[in-house]
Amino acid sequence: IRRQRQMCIRDRFMLGAKAVQMGTHFVATEESIVHENYKNAIIKAKDIDSRVTGRSTGHPVRALRNQMTKKYLDLEKNGASFEELEHLTLGGLRKAVVDGDVTNGSVMAGQSAAMVKEIMSCKDLIQKLVSETDALIGGKGFYE
């Protein structure tokens, strides 16, 4: 899995990217104020565990699969109104982030959540990413 993350970052740089999005990984750091249940849900996630809800409303959101996403996708599939969908998700992020309800709350996370395997400090995460990517790319100086 670590190799997959390294390759993913390297490949994007080789295609001309100047940066990669790492929000999900930083949510699961020691410094993040989200509930421990949220962090643990990310760490336990498999590569098939994220779902996109809200396509029908024009406001897509990627979140980890749970009861809330299942209900939302069922409602969306059956043509529920914007108001019905809004009612289901109202306060959903707070439920997950503050209350730790990762079953009924909105556990927003990117496609790469499965690559997050441990809670570490932001400093350690950045150092690890830089050293792993440098090793793959071929040494220092790539980022300058």
What residue spans do the PLM features occupy?
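Conserved active-site-proximal phosphate/metal-binding subdomains
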Residues: 10-144
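Single conserved hydrophobic/aromatic residue that forms the stacking wall/gate
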Residues: 1-9
